Amino acid sequence: MVQKVLSRQSDNSQDVSAEQLDVVESGSIDQQNIRAWVVRKVKENDKRTSTNQSFKWEAVKPASCLDAANEKFMYLHGGREKSGISNSLFKLDLDSCTVYSHNRGEDNDSPARVGHSIVCSADTIYLFGGCDSETDSTFEVGDNSLYAYNFKSNQWNLVSTQSPLPSPRTGHSMLLVDSKLWIFGGECQGKYLNDIHLFDTKGVDRRTQSELKQKANANNVEKANMEFDETDWSWETPFLHSSSPPPRSNHSVTLVQGKIFVHGGHNDTGPLSDLWLFDLETLSWTEVRSIGRFPGPREGHQATTIDDTVYIYGGRDNKGLILNELWAFNYSQQRWSLVSNPIPILLSDSSSYKIVSKNNHILLLYLNALDAPKQLLCYEADPKNLYWDKDKFSDIPVLQHISMKPSNASNHTVSLGYLNDRPNHSKKNSVTSTSSSQFNNFLEQNQKAVRSARHRHYASLDEQGLHSLRNLSKTSGMNHSADFSLHEFGQADPFAYEIEKPIASLPLPNGNDTISRSSESSSPINESESNSLLKLQSDFKFSNSDDRVAWLEEQLLYCMQQGYTLKPPNLFQHVDEKLRLEKKEQLSYLEILKVIEQMLESNEQKFKKQIVSLASENAKLAAQRDAAVENANYSRSLIQKKTTDETVGSLIEKVGKLEYEVQGTLEEATSYYQKNTELQQLLKQNESASELLKSRNEKLCVDYDKLRSVFEEDSSKILSLQKENENLQSQILQISEELVDYRSRCEALEYGNYELETKLIEMHDRVEMQTNVIEASASALDVSNTAILSFEDSLRRERDEKSTLQQKCLNLQYEYENVRIELENLQSRALELESALEQSVSDAKYSKAIMQSGLSKLLSSINENKDNLKEFSKSKQKISYLESQLEGLHELLRESQRLCEGRTKELLNSQQKLYDLKHSYSSVMTEKSKLSDQVNDLTEQAKITQRKLSEVQIALADSKMNQQLSGKDSTDVHLPTDFSASSSPLRSYFNEEDSFNNASAAHSSKESDIPSGGVFTKYRNHFGNLMTSEETKAPDNNDLHKRLSDVINSQQKFLSLSPQVSKDYYDVRSKLNDTAGSFSGEEMRAIDDNYYASRIKQLEDDYQKAITYANCSDESFQQLSHSFM
């Protein structure tokens, strides 16, 4: 589908029009360069409606229909047709070169626009501004509505925005950058704009079209088909950190390296050629002054970007001619380049063209209405395959050597006069000067400076141009050879000129001054002048003087194109600068006048020197002219001698060029003479101005004396006023100090009131918290009391059950057959008792812990708040009430302690745990982590004590049985053999008890929060193991007495912690010692029962106390230990 233009063998060669082929075959354009461009035939989509039988682009003017492109498609909208302003929308697939129409016939809701701007994203096209009036041919009345076209719904939507809105405009530019629309410039009712606006397109919600038509205005047919946003959005005008470019419209714009690129355009002064960059991050404008040549003024041109290079194409100059040029601007090098491959198309007023980039290729969409049949062509080229005319010496910044100063936009400037339509060229292989026809485009007679703060002019352009040449010769360090061409200094196309045109006459100077060329040409040139001319040429390092003259003319023209204008040196410029610097010192009028006189004298000397230099320059130019004539005569003689046609043709061409150079030199001489006369006139004006200044000086001296007298009188008044001012200032300082003190006191009082209020509020909150804690502690004490009562009942029941169990054991010898049934009942009852005991222990433990924690918190809170509550009577009443409640709690606590001390008389084995707990009390204050190990030691010791208790109980049971059997056997007190066997009732009872203990031990291991279960279970295990050991013999009373004494002696060291148990112990011990052999069986059993019942009760209470000690905090632990001890 892609084919070269000149390749006629392909079927697509017919896509190129006849006019284009004529251009190619005529030889005016290099065919090798044209082959870099390829043409792609644009096809129309087959699926089109009857309303889209042909494209309505025949009468569309260039740049009147706007385009937008994304990564794959290019969209064209609107424009002016023969029938009026169009609202058609077409889509061009850049890959397949297929055109699709988005028009829907009569239901087409697209806005008709011309002079508008459109951009597109992935799924939306945005349209802003333009003109929709068919009668307005100048497009001065614009629109400020924003439309959005959605690709999915195929509908145009009117985006409603809040005020302030951008002014209506045409010819503006719009870019979409990161979902934000940026609008710049344009024209509104004949006024050119340079403002910039921003609109964020994120989150624009729209209503359905049916809801819109019900609310839209029926008179506005176009807007009745649009959708309005449900949410209003607003335009933003960003705050710029720099001044804006001059106002303009119909400029080109694109995005390069995150900056908005703006070039050219049109305003009141005509087409523009300046280049600006807008930084989106810093919101600042920067004018780019490129190195070397640059495009001329133009408007309506197209721009696109590939990497960091911007390509612009087309546009119109100041005469309205369409420019078939492709320029490239390298952003990193800040340099312009012109392509040497002209695009093989003929641009006209009826042709349209659009330029985009795709896959690093340049695509040019072109339609020429003169073709028959009319076709839409797409030209494609790779920028790498194009030949660009770049400067050979890129290190020579030509324009940087010329200083530029801001213009005051005065209406009186020096004109260069009329120039005829004649090109002016230098010799062969030299810098070509600009054609005189281009001067007529920009330098008309009585031309005035451009009224813009961004435009500049030269101060003494001649002197600066020569100075720049001297700097160039010193800094460039290059040897300009004979083939030094115009490209080294940057020739600006489209001001390229054709060398075939002859010169009719030289330009005439302004005014009535005339110069005779014959007299100027006949001036003699001596040998010294010719030598100085050669020296001048060698200093400037040009091949000849014509090169320098041509370069100077060219640079002058470039500056005029950019808005600069020639002006004479400002006589008072240095004076003004010095006056501004010395204004702060308040010089007298006499000193200022002296400075002015000195500056006038120095300026007069400078003008005289300039006149002398111009005279010598005229002499040098005359010598150059004579040398050129001699060279021409010499060339003619050579032509006559040779007979070869090629030599004759080249010499004729050379002669013609030499004639042009001579005439150019004469033109330069006339211009310099004109400048000389103007400088002389300025010198006369300066002399007259100096005389006026002298007369004014005398008047100023008289005025100065009068002002001095007035000043002396005013000085005395000023001194008195200063004294009064000082007094007032001192009074003001005193008042201000008093005011500061008063404010500080008020602030201190306010701060104190605020602190009192905060303390009162905090105190009130603390009192409420204390009442809540006391109520909670009272309820916890009630619960603990009920738990203690239930625990006492359970212990009482347990005591009764143990007594029944002992009676059953004594009657085992008489009820052998019923023993097993009774043992099972005892086993179930024992399990219930154990669970009830464990539950009561855990409840007591929990209630005691809650009580102790509540009491500790209550004590700490009361101690902290007693001082603060003294100031408030209500708080005192509450505190007294709380103290009364606290006393009641202490009484309850004492009662509970008494109850706990009463329980210490039942279990003897807990004395060993209590001893260990007392021993660990000294170390728990420094190392609480050892408390758990001590509790484990207590449990082991309780196991040992329980084992010993089991042995004592077994011995007691044996003694009882032996005493009962003593009535039957007179001599021996042994148990029967059946009782000692494994099948005896007592042995079977303890075997079953062993299995029961194993089950209960497994159950108690799960109840980790009740450590007493495992201890009692192991006691029973040890008792069962003792019963299942070797055959048990019934001891006598002496043996039983001995064994009981040994057990009591082993527990003597633990009895010191329980006074009541110790007393019982010594009573029993004394009885045993006194009546060792006189006790009967019944008395012995009664003594044993009472003794072991008290020991068991004491052990249970001590163990419960140890658990309470282990679970309480440090502070409550100290309080409990102090109260218990």
UniProtKB/Swiss-Prot annotation:
Keywords: Kelch repeat, Phosphoprotein, Repeat. This is Tip elongation aberrant protein 3. GO terms for biological process: cell growth mode switching, monopolar to bipolar; establishment or maintenance of bipolar cell polarity. Kelch repeats lie at residues 73-123, 124-179, 181-226, 259-308, 310-360. GO terms for cellular component: cell cortex of cell tip; cell division site; cytoplasm; division septum. Acts as a cell end marker required for efficient new end take-off (NETO), whereby growth is activated at the cell end to generate bipolarity in extending cells. Also required for proper placement of the septum. The modification Phosphoserine is found at S430, S437, S460, S523, S980, S982, S983, S984, S1078, S1080.
